């Protein structure tokens, strides 16, 4: 019997820093090709204010087998799932700051495969995050399904006084009351925050309500995060540590482009009508079909406006079902000094289904508290095989005036935990030589 191939080890921990998040994929593929991480069953710890788990809607599933074409097709919100369908990634722990909650807390098991009717990549999860983009299909509609185990884990800030408590073995940080808006508290009241195993054909949460209530108190603490991660990452596992710097401070860049009134109108146009609680397959498919038509109609409407946004065209489009708000929106946009960018308007609308993108510009103190939180749970994990970092500053998801400071602090904690780093600043106009990081 042939012995399994020897696992290769980097002399120093490689850290690839890119600007746009999907640019990390080429570096992950290179690590697969060099056999530093396995071809399949890859585990990823993903720190981000956004899940990045959407799917290129119209991309043929077989594109994943053509690396160069795939890299051209990917975008910042959809770079992980193609790697799942390709069979590379099987476990993702999405660690999100307390201000960002696009997917229910807990464990979700789903399948990612090729939709037999459209030949595109689709998913069996029934979570609103996927339903609102019309990405759900039943398991029996998928060819070559691959299982994805997704763990959604909240991270709360840790203040210096709590660091002392943690060193004495006490529980970690809780979300400060001042940071809990009424919407946040209602969301937590409505959302089960327990980690529960779920079947591959969906991701509906279940569990005893009283047990859920007891567990809520510890969500976000260092001990809670550590327990969840160590259930996924074993000491000998090669894994990817992926960090978007907007995890520490995050903007919704569309807030600078549109007024609150325009956002309200976009929400009316793009509002997602959820299925009833515990929907059957027929209701789910009707929901997906309805949402697909809605998004296609909106895309077509804004494409028409690119050609002609005169009064007659706007009135004709606004007369269609669900399009009433279009008239006021276009009127508001045309009152600006510069002509509307209707393609950008549509992109903004796609973020306004039932919730806006996360927006929390952190103070320097808040950034440090999140840095401390990350350091505390990372020190309990084995050393990652590779680290990928996205700056997300040119598209303004991470504030440009904060990104360099955050990057320095993140590199500092990585070096303090894992020793000398092999840092590649891939975002610079002239790529820097691979260098060891010094504080």
UniProtKB/Swiss-Prot annotation:
Superkingdom as given in the UniProt entry: Eukaryota
Region of interest called Disordered, as start-end residue ranges on this chain: 163-219
Segments of skewed composition (Polar residues): 179-211
Family, per entry: Belongs to the UPF0489 family.
Name of the protein in question: UPF0489 protein C5orf22 homolog
Naturally occurring in which organism (per UniProt): Danio rerio
